[in-house]
Swiss-Prot record:
Its cofactor is Mg(2+); Ca(2+); Mn(2+); Co(2+). Binds 1 Mg(2+) ion per subunit. Can also utilize other divalent metal cations, such as Ca(2+), Mn(2+) and Co(2+). Binds 1 thiamine pyrophosphate per subunit. NCBIfam families: tktlase_bact (TIGR00232). This is Transketolase. It comes from Buchnera aphidicola subsp. Baizongia pistaciae (strain Bp). Pfam families: Transket_pyr, Transketolase_C_1, Transketolase_N. It is an enzyme of class 2 (transferase). Belongs to the transketolase family. The lineage of its organism: Bacteria, Pseudomonadati, Pseudomonadota, Gammaproteobacteria, Enterobacterales. One of its GO terms (biological process) is pentose-phosphate shunt. Catalyzes the transfer of a two-carbon ketol group from a ketose donor to an aldose acceptor, via a covalent intermediate with the cofactor thiamine pyrophosphate. SUPFAM superfamilies: Thiamin diphosphate-binding fold (THDP-binding) (SSF52518), TK C-terminal domain-like (SSF52922). Its EC number is 2.2.1.1.
Length: 666
């Protein structure tokens, strides 16, 4: 057996042993891609196992994340803090080797992957981030940002629609440092893909403006190495390397079959496979000579030390740029940023305006853009509607050091790309579309929350208030759907002041995404005290604090807060005292201490009403099963905003009568 094959077989052996030990997992892909991984990681991949977060490391994304044991095996072999005992605990509760790669669980894992295609989208984001950051900070002889993004994908990734969205955009942007390996083994869970996947992948990607290296023997290290060298030479296009492989390579009875995809080989087949591969070692045993050839600790330290030396020279020559680079990579805001943001909010308080919250958001962006150069925005072909561009927005297509991405109509791809930009570092991304189209992107929003990504999602045209475009564009259930995703802070502000504070919360939050739900129609600014402004940060607060001993609480969000205040005035004239609560963020409110929640919603105040132009079921947690909810549980219609609010009962007189009836009946 040649040395190169022996090194690849170490990946195969560890993968089949771990899957067999766990009695679950996916051995076929690691067995099929082991030779590709050996060539990439030993000949080309730039990293430092001693410091997995070295800034100028290459990025590796396993988009076909079910083959996680391939990555875990490589990380163990190259010297990361991942032991044999960790591999033996593969897929076990509490281990750092979960079934699919999870960022934060395993050193060396750059991105949580599993839902096919999303890793590819994130990789496009990382390649965008690398190029944009490089164009901002690099100077002659000082390429402090200079590395590749490498991706493994399978048939499933390329069948997913997101692959079209993100690869089309990557080709348009000419991301020359993005190199993707396609594991073309012709097998998926259901069998041979020729029955459902007959795309001409080579010409598909050429049409995207990609460089394609086809017909690479995925089990011949010379062919693989030659293909990578070919791809590296192409600077103005991303590259796809199509590797012909055999799933379950080495298994006498399961290679080339779907039976090797997602289940242990079985004890007998493991023995037969190792015999065929010439692997004579017990389970989880790697000979020292294999470790010696795989270990990358020394080379990694040398690479990082060389970069540190270069960065020191850069720092000496360009100290301001170097400090700005370090600030951005460290995720620290600029000096005086918080003070300036607070001054900006105070100005909004002193100079009230009746404007749509999407306009208010754009005004905040005008302030943020001048204060936070790390802010990088984009919209799914709705910039004039979402209002996501500010006066100094620059398209990265026209200027690679720009700060704005025209994503085109690619909501899902846009969000996955934004996840990659966020995890790359040095940027705070925001992306936008209509709230009704959030459903296209929802899976990537969920991944953002799972990965604790600082990502900002702008969803405008937040209700039937968008008007004449009709029910296809009018969100009903989307707002609640977002709130139900764990770790997403959802804000639906009622005016420009709440909008600014929602943005401030999003910028300050480092452990998860924030969704800003914004109106198309003009909303009135509400009068508040400084104490009330402070309480906006708590997600929910009392708007009409002068009311003492109320009989009923009305809680509302967004455009319905003004309606709630009008209702309270009508009921006051009828002798009914009402407390109005604005709850711009139910998620943030739920995180408050029990005393504050009791202060807002005293248990003794059992008469409660919720008003929101969306699905009603969500609000029972606040008003109780006997509460009154004014919501919308059908789809909308085409008409003006005023007509629709009236038709669906969002009228202060109608709601007042409903509340009176509710109080009488209870």
């Amino acid at each position: 057996m040649c040395l190169r094959r022996k090194l690849a077989n170490a990946i195969r052996a560890l993968s089949i042993d771990a899957v067999q030990e766990a009695q679950s997992g996916h051995p076929g892909m690691p067995m099929g891609m082991a030779d590709i991984a050996e060539v990439l990681w030993r000949e080309f991949f730039k990293h430092n196992p001693k410091n997995p977060l070295w800034n100028n490391r290459d990025r590796f994304i396993l988009s076909n994340g079910h083959g996680s044991m391939l990555l875990y095996s490589i990380l163990h072999l190259t010297g990361y803090k991942l032991s044999i005992d960790d591999l033996k605990k593969f897929r076990q509760l509490g281990s750092n080797t979960p079934g699919h790669p999870e960022i934060g669980s395993t050193p060396g894992v750059e991105m949580t992957t599993g839902p096919l295609g999303q890793g590819l989208g994130a990789a496009v984001g990382m390649a965008i981030a690398e190029r944009t950051l490089a164009s901002t900070f690099n100077k002659p002889n000082y390429d402090i940002v200079d590395h590749y993004t490498w991706v493994f994908v399978g048939d499933g990734c390329l069948m997913e629609g997101i692959s079209h969205e993100v690869c089309s955009l990557a080709g348009t942007f000419g991301l020359g440092k993005l190199i993707v390996f396609y594991d073309s083994n012709g097998i998926s869970i259901d069998g041979k893909v020729e029955e459902w996947f007959t795309d001409d992948t080579e010409n598909r990607f050429k049409a995207y403006n990609w460089h394609v290296v086809s017909n690479v023997d995925g089990h011949d290290y010379r062919s693989i190495s030659s293909a990578i060298k070919d791809a590296i030479l192409v600077k103005n296009k991303p590259s796809l390397i199509i590797c012909k492989t055999i799933i379950g390579y080495g298994s006498p009875n399961k290679s080339g079959l779907e039976t090797s995809h997602g289940a242990p080989l079985g004890e007998n087949e493991v023995l037969l496979t190792k015999q065929k591969l010439g692997w004579t070692y017990p389970p989880f045993v790697i000979p020292q000579d294999v470790y010696d050839h795989w270990n990358f600790n020394l080379q990694g330290v040398i690479l990082e030390n060389e970069w540190n030396k270069k960065f020191q020279g850069y720092y000496n020559k360009y100290p301001d740029l170097a400090n700005e680079y370090l600030r951005r990579i460290s995720k620290n805001v600029p000096d005086k940023f918080v003070d300036n943001f607070n001054k900006f909010i105070k100005e909004l308080y002193l100079c009230p305006k009746n404007i749509a919250t999407r306009v208010a958001s754009q005004n905040v962006l005008e302030f943020l853009g001048k204060s936070l150069p790390e802010l990088i925005g984009g919209s799914a072909d709705l910039a004039p509607s979402n209002l996501t561009m500010w006066s100094k927005s620059k398209s990265i297509k026209q200027d690679i050091s720009g700060n704005y991405v025209h994503y085109g109509v690619r909501e899902f791809g846009m969000t996955a790309i934004s996840n990659g930009i966020a995890h790359y570092g040095g940027f705070i991304p925001y992306v936008a579309t209509f709230l009704a189209f959030m459903d296209y992107a929802r899976s990537a929003v969920r991944m953002s929350a799972l990965m604790k990504t600082q990502n900002i999602f702008i969803y405008s045209h937040d209700s039937i208030g968008l008007g004449e475009d009709g029910p296809t564009h009018q969100p009903i259930e989307q707002l609640s759907a977002l709130r139900f995703i764990p770790n997403v802070n959802v804000w639906r502000p009622c005016d420009q002041l709440e909008t600014a504070i929602a943005w401030k919360n999003a910028i300050e939050r480092k452990d998860g995404p924030t969704a800003l739900i914004l109106s198309r129609q003009i909303l009135c600014q509400i009068d508040r005290s400084q104490e009330q402004i402070n309480d906006i940060y708590r997600g929910g607060y009392i708007v009409n604090t002068t009311v003492r001993s109320p009989k009923v609480i009305i809680v509302a969000t967004g455009s319905e807060v003004k309606i709630a205040l009008d209702v309270s005035n009508i009921l006051f004239k009828k002798g009914i005292l009402v407390r109005v609560v604005s709850m711009p963020s139910t998620n943030v409110f739920d995180q408050q201490d029990n005393d504050y929640k009791e202060f807002i919603f005293p248990r003794c105040l059992v008469h409660r009403v919720a008003i929101e132009a969306g699905i009603s079921d969500f609000w029972y947690k606040y008003v109780g099963l006997t509460g009154c909810i004014i919501g919308i549980d059908t789809f909308g219609e085409s008409g003006s905003s005023d007509q629709l609010f009236s038709k669906f009962g969002f009228n202060s007189d109608i709601i007042s009568e409903k509340i009176i009836s509710y109080l009488k009946s209870s």
